Regions:
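Conserved acidic donor-binding segment of nucleotide-sugar-dependent glycosyltransferases
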Residues: 324-325, 329-335, 344-349
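Short alpha-helical donor nucleotide-sugar binding micro-motif in glycosyltransferases
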Residues: 77, 271-272, 279-284
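A short, active-site helix/loop in glycosyltransferases that binds the activated sugar's phosphate group
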Residues: 39-40, 139-181
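A short, well-ordered alpha-helix in the C-terminal region of glycosyltransferases
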Residues: 196, 350-365, 374-377
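Short hydrophobic beta-strand element within catalytic cores of glycosyltransferases
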Residues: 309-312
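A conserved mid-protein helix/loop that constitutes part of the nucleotide-sugar donor-binding site
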Residues: 14-19, 205, 209-228, 369
Length: 384
């Protein structure tokens, strides 16, 4: 069976499907990956045994760009005689599902990695919510990456319950908790070098975040919470380590950037290579994720796999990623609510217990070895 997976950017394929595609190829599927080109494509294709076709798939709503992409996809689908087309991310999925429907493809699968309208207002919210409904109506199956996202889809009428699925406990296919996100693999000398590079000491209590530095991720609230915390506990040497770069489309205000720059205890790494992400998690005492919306909070389970306790929001896609009082604690999406969670995490025995439980949960629920067979089961169920 020949499957075409359509992505707006190649990074989505590399981040979430590297290894999983190889697993599916070994099950007998032929996979063609479609996205904008990338220098990482050749190595990815060799590792996974897939083919790649470069096409310009728009990331934003542009009628002319979407029309051009749909025409190109229709031509490709007919040439390849695809048995199934998978669409990822809102606009990429719109192009993929529309083209597949026009070509009469029997299996049209929309991977809903998240929804963006929930943090919008007015006409913009209506437009993007309508787009979600339209894409889902074109699909024969919708794979939501979390159970909370599935509940939201039903509440907001995005699609019927009969066509939507979640893989296991959620995510696109889990993480590698054995060979990548594994605290036992951390080189102590390398970790010490990284700690010194970031100006951290053994005396510091390090709160951390990983991801895009933007409003939707709750960065303004997190920075203010850290300021409250330091004011309340001046004798504690606390640091806030933000692992990631500043986002352009949803960037924090200039005033907030100045606040961050003027606080020597707020450390911003900028974009870092994915190979060193486990080392950055290892620098943390507590992982904080005050996001306003997610498909699934992947960095939460990455941090949990590294035995880090988590302060998490209850937003859709976030709420699934921890078990309250067992692997982490929920916090209110406000500066004072996050600060209250930080205070709770001053208990080192609590941090250790939550961290140990977190890794155990990831191994049981989200490791590749657990998730990939479930992906195979889903494909057998939904593909005709």
């Amino acid at each position: 069976m020949k499957l075409i997976h359509v992505f707006s950017i190649f990074g989505t394929a590399e981040s979430f499907f590297d290894g999983q595609f190889e697993y599916l190829v070994n099950l007998g599927y032929e996979i063609v990956v479609v996205s904008s080109d990338s220098p990482l494509v050749d190595a990815f294709c060799r590792r996974n045994g897939v083919r790649f076709v470069p096409l310009c798939i728009p990331r934003s709503v542009s009628p002319s760009a979407i029309t051009k992409a749909v025409k190109a996809l229709c031509s490709l689908i007919r040439t390849e005689k695809a048995d199934a087309v998978f669409g990822h991310t809102p606009v990429g999925a719109l192009c993929a599902m529309f083209a597949a429907r026009m070509c009469g493809v029997k299996n049209r699968v929309y991977y809903r990695h998240g929804v963006i309208y929930t943090t919008m207002r007015g006409l913009k919210r209506t437009i993007f919510k309508t787009e979600e409904k339209f894409v889902a109506s074109l699909a024969t199956s919708v794979v939501n990456v979390s159970h909370s996202l599935s509940r939201l889809a039903i509440i907001d009428g995005l699609n019927g319950v009969e066509k939507q699925y979640v893989i296991g406990h959620g995510t696109c296919g889990g993480i590698d908790a054995q060979n990548i996100f594994n605290p036992d693999l951390i080189d102590k000398v390398k970790l010490l070098t990284l700690k010194e590079k970031n100006g951290l000491t053994h005396a510091d209590v390090v709160f951390g975040f990983c991801g895009r530095i933007c409003n939707d991720k709750g960065i303004p609230e997190l920075v203010d919470a850290f300021e409250f915390f330091k004011g309340k506990y001046p004798d504690i040497s606390a640091k806030l380590l933000l692992i990631g770069g500043f986002d352009i489309r949803d960037g924090v205000s200039e005033a907030k950037k100045r606040q961050m720059r003027n606080d020597p205890d707020v450390l911003v790494t900028g974009n870092v290579d994915k190979d060193v992400i486990p080392y950055y998690y290892s620098l943390l005492d507590v992982f904080v994720f005050p996001s306003h919306r997610e498909g699934f909070g992947m960095c939460v389970i990455e941090a949990s796999a590294m035995e880090k306790p988590v302060l998490d929001s209850r937003a859709h896609g976030c709420v699934d990623a921890i078990v309250e009082h067992e692997t982490g604690e929920y916090v209110e999406l406000s500066a004072r609510g996050i600060c209250k969670g930080m205070e709770m995490m001053l208990d080192s025995s609590l941090r250790q217990r939550l961290g140990r439980n977190g890794r155990r949960r990831v191994l049981n629920c989200y490791d590749f070895k657990v998730m990939w067979p479930l992906v195979g089961d889903l494909y057998r169920k939904i593909l005709k």
